[in-house]
Amino acid sequence: YLCCKALQDVPAFACRIRGENVVELGEQKPSFTDLKKGSELFHIVTMPCEGSIAEFCERAREVSGKQDCFIDMAGQADDLIYFSCLPWMDVTAVTNERELLAPNARDDSIPRICWGKYILENDRVYLGISVEVNHRLIDGVHIGRFAEALTRRIQALK
């Protein structure tokens, strides 16, 4: 939720390449992996990032619980943000699956965000986050702005 909101704070993350054009989207939807209780098979949940953090989490629980397929293809479009989490290990980088031989692979501009296990060290919490983007649209300055926005949003939880 906070990552999605922080990405929405940086307009460059809303840009997508469509043919010869770059468009700026309005709403972007998180599309994330989830494990059903008692299973090691994950599925991909896609839903709007709406309401408060508590409302979003409750809605995500409902949507995930009712989903009976690996991925609902009806909700798949380029207005997504892909999220994944590896809470079992600290991560410094993650590479996501991409169809590099597809004709429009170079235009894939859906951001992919992954984080791992947080580390507590000297009374500070560290969390490695991997951010994959299309460099034709997003540069280091935008990723830095995302990191700053995410930090502000996390600190506002206190």
Place the predicted regions along the sequence by residue.
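Short intrinsically disordered coil segments
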Residues: 46-49, 97-102, 128-130, 146-148
